[in-house]
Amino acid sequence: MSSAEADSVPPEVRRQWQELAETVREHQFRYYIKDAPIISDAEFDALFNELLALEERHPELRVADSPTQLVGGAGFATDFAEAAHLERMLSLDDVFDTDELIAWSNRVENEIGKDPHYLCELKIDGVALSLVYRDGRLERAATRGDGRVGEDVTLNARTIDDVPERLSPSDDFPVPALLEVRGEVFFLLADFEALNASLVEDGKAPFANPRNSAAGSLRQKNPAVTARRKLRMICHGIGRTEGFSPKTQHEAYTALSVWGLPVAEQTARVRGLAAVQERIGYWGEHRYELQHEIDGVVVKVDDVALQRRLGATSRAPRWAVAYKYPPQEAQTKLLDIRVNVGRTGRVTPFAFMTPVKVAGSTVGLATLHNAAEVKRKGVLIGDTVMIRKAGDVIPEVLGPVVDLRDGTEREFVMPTTCPECGTPLAPAKEGDADIRCPNARSCPAQLRERVFHVAGRGALDIEGLGYEAATALLKAGVIADEGDLFALTEDDLLRTELFRTKAGTLSANGTRLLQNLQKAKKVALWRVLVALSIRHVGPTAARALATEFGDLDSIMSASTERLAAVEGVGPTIAAALTEWFTVDWHRAIVDKWRGAGVRMADERDASVPRTLEGLTVVVTGSLAGFSRDDAKEAILARGGKAAGSVSKKTDYVVAGDSPGSKYDKAVELGVPILDEDGFRKLLAEGPPETPAD
């Protein structure tokens, strides 16, 4: 850079660039070398893109050792021996929205023509690894490093079950003399959780997320430690080869699979950008169903000759890009851990955190399940923690960022008495991880939660009886427990401030609540069973019981063995039912509801044909003429079983709009799939008769 060029950059801009470049390099060091980042991927991407934009505006700043021009951990010395890659191991450029994806596609297609074939691959959130095979035998494994030279981790890589020592020959794909293959090392979520649990048990700091744990495990000094950690690998590219020249990336993956190397079964070959966007949308919706974490979809031009024409920059190929989903993980401060008492008395610790945006919503609260889970995760009050929110799933605290501790953090101590009523807490039975408040009858927290639960959509579905109303009715003393709900009168509601106008008359909400309570007296029996707050009894078991017995008295008088024999019930739920009905005040609730006119038996419609007797039907997607509950009840009313998952025992799958993974499973197993019209015909006529031999 000449002095004239250097002088053209304003001093304040140069200072901004120097500070930003130094910050980015510090975070790269923590990520690639220490395996202990202190900011989220999204926060790093924002810093990196800010640096990139600054260099776009002032190209003079784009020097050779800028973080934007280097790959991964370039320039950092480590304790592992160096290993030179035979062909440069590049990174990927990222795009974060549809406009950026279209801009990338336009650049590609302007060079090679319209609507090429693309490969869409899951972007696994792990650590990159390069393997070299000579004459089919594993010679060396190396991390990415700076893209030219990485770290030799051969001994550790050999402990990974997915990495074969020798390649399997094939007539279609002879084993090449030289094969350099690239892939990603990662943890399955279940294995990551088991590893963290064992670390905490040994008094060691847990990993903050699966990516960090994969990097840390691959770079262990003792290969025996790596061997115990159940690392996995997926191959996603090739480097230098001798004796193998695939025409497409897709062909390369087929060969790798034949040779015994792991490739992702979800990879799709599509034509044109519209099909790419469809795959990105699909995995954006279904990524939480995978057994491992992904943070996006990698899009590649499939034709190898076209890849060569497009070439690469100093850090990434021009023929591939990573579409990154909004972050599902973020870092925030754990301000406190407080406990909540639920409707069955379970005492649950919750993490109260500085609100942070993650997976499209603001999160400030997450469950920690029980004291054992708090210990297993190794979190302290005051920690900076990693949190995850996957779709509509309740946010989860993954673990602490140990490097950011300053000594002010403190351990959480589970209370020994109920914070609501003062009753000593204890497990329901020996060995339970959860502790409970045994004062079920009069603990204020349990009363509130049970009254609120009665009105839930999965129970009696009483609009107007929310958490605020449940609290107000109990506080006013117009109900002692949920048994009094159906005896409520206008005078009772007038004594409750929430339902009284300033003029002293009943509010519109109060009138609606009384009307909705009357309507709730005529609901299906399974809803009544759910509303009683019997432990373990949810909608599925309740439906099975209602279908089998038809009325509450028969359920109450049935033996535990008889209840357990009902499909979908089993011994645990059966024991909970028997125990619940032996308690006097529980039976008093049933008697109060019965006395108030709540229907305790299903009225079987003799006109409804038993067309689905003995059949198992699964519904997936949205149906125009049925809600999900309506469809299930239609199946049950005709003698069928409405299952929640697809198996070889499933007789039919009904697929509406936007079906999920159940549809894919049905295709895989060859289960008959019906649209809504086919479903209506099945309900009316039953399955077609099998012709006699």
UniProtKB/Swiss-Prot annotation:
Write down the chemical reaction(s) this protein catalyses: NAD(+) + (deoxyribonucleotide)n-3'-hydroxyl + 5'-phospho-(deoxyribonucleotide)m = (deoxyribonucleotide)n+m + AMP + beta-nicotinamide D-nucleotide
The record's active-site residues are 123
What is the required cofactor set for this protein? Mg(2+); Mn(2+)
Top-rank lineage group of the source organism = Bacteria
Does the record bear DNA repair in its keywords? yes
Q: What class of enzyme is it?
A: ligase
| BRCT domain ranges (all copies) | 607-693
GO CC, any one term: cytosol
Q: Is Zinc set as a keyword in this record? A: yes
Annotated SUPFAM superfamilies: BRCT domain (SSF52113), DNA ligase/mRNA capping enzyme, catalytic domain (SSF56091), Nucleic acid-binding proteins (SSF50249), RuvA domain 2-like (SSF47781)
Q: What does this protein do?
A: DNA ligase that catalyzes the formation of phosphodiester linkages between 5'-phosphoryl and 3'-hydroxyl groups in double-stranded DNA using NAD as a coenzyme and as the energy source for the reaction. It is essential for DNA replication and repair of damaged DNA.
Q: Which Pfam families match?
A: BRCT, DNA_ligase_aden, DNA_ligase_OB, DNA_ligase_ZBD, HHH_2, Nlig-Ia
The SS bond pairs are: none
Q: In which family does this protein belong, per the annotation? A: Belongs to the NAD-dependent DNA ligase family. LigA subfamily.
Which molecular function GO terms apply here?
Answer: DNA binding; DNA ligase (NAD+) activity; metal ion binding
One GO BP annotation of this record: DNA replication
Which InterPro entries does the entry mention? BRCT_dom, BRCT_dom_sf, DisA/LigA_HHH, DNA_ligase, DNA_ligase_AS, DNA_ligase_CS, DNAligase_adenylation, DNAligase_N
Q: Which UniProt keywords apply?
A: DNA damage, DNA repair, DNA replication, Ligase, Magnesium, Manganese, Metal-binding, NAD, Zinc
Per the UniProt entry, the Enzyme Commission number(s) are 6.5.1.2
* Stated name of the protein: DNA ligase
| Binding-site list for NAD(+) | 41-45, 91-92, 121, 144, 184, 300, 324
Which of this chain's residues are annotated to bind Zn(2+)?
418, 421, 437, 443
